[in-house]
Amino acid sequence: MIEFDNLTYLHGKPQGTGLLKANPEDFVVVEDLGFEPDGEGEHILVRILKNGCNTRFVADALAKFLKIHAREVSFAGQKDKHAVTEQWLCARVPGKEMPDLSAFQLEGCQVLEYARHKRKLRLGALKGNAFTLVLREVSNRDDVEQRLIDICVKGVPNYFGAQRFGIGGSNLQGALRWAQTNTPVRDRNKRSFWLSAARSALFNQIVAERLKKADVNQVVDGDALQLAGRGSWFVATTEELAELQRRVNDKELMITAALPGSGEWGTQREALAFEKAAVAAETELQALLVREKVEAARRAMLLYPQQLSWNWWDDVTVEIRFWLPAGSFATSVVRELINTTGDYAHIAE
């Protein structure tokens, strides 16, 4: 299995180095739910600005403040502890009056707003995230500048970031041990992390192999294509290749890669044969996903950062802003720009 740092680059390996997250303020994330609170209901949506706190810790503290069980506080996604992040938490408080959340005190946290809402905020129920990153000690400004220009046009590989696999790859290692021993895993969190790591690693492998062998944006017979921003897909046929290629070039359609699991993968003929060959050696992980009834799905192979802009503070420091849809990784953008020092794995999704 290819490690994250060794996955194939779309724009070639960066020529320069730099520092990501020299300070928490160098990594700012603003969550975009894509909807506004209802203004009524048994839940309260709370928008929190935090620095130096992980999401679960803040959620538990909020539950304690509201005198409710920790499971009654939910969130759409984990945000990094070592960053400045803005996100929504959701507390279920049926039959209770609206509390004064301005009295909620936690070091490194600030309540920005809160309102009633009708529904629980579930994991993954967000539109995306806006990022403001500062790269410091950049050793090759010209290379980074050109890469930013190229990314505006060609995007980046839509890899799952190293944080998906845990510190030191612990989640993927757990999945491999589970696959090899067939011992039941009772812990729901471990099950979720390990299965997610297994499927994500196989997806990354398929995309990396496609980048090695051919133009990742070249439609082949049997490819599974999806409308940009949509989840459903259809299969390309030989007769349609020219027209489908035009639509891919226009970014109207996206070529997808498999998220392996049980059931059909979604591709056919040439594309299916390629995907199967790309992960043929990973029989244990594939068998684990089938055994645990994780359904196969699809994910776009390329990611196009939206609203991408940048500003050089000086020759070695650049501020970069962009927006990514839910499930995408800022670190997959950064790895196409510079060779960073430090470990990506501690950066939450």
From Swiss-Prot:
Q: Which family does it belong to?
A: Belongs to the pseudouridine synthase TruD family.
Question: Enzyme class, one word?
Answer: isomerase
Q: Which reaction does it catalyse?
A: uridine(13) in tRNA = pseudouridine(13) in tRNA
The cross-references to PANTHER family, in alphabetical order and at most eight, read:
TRNA PSEUDOURIDINE SYNTHASE D
Q: What is its EC number?
A: 5.4.99.27
Protein name, entry field:
tRNA pseudouridine synthase D
The family database entries (CDD domains) matched by this protein are listed as: PseudoU_synth_EcTruD
Any one annotated GO CC term: cytosol
Active site positions, chain numbering: D80
**What is an annotated GO biological process for this record, any one?**
tRNA pseudouridine synthesis
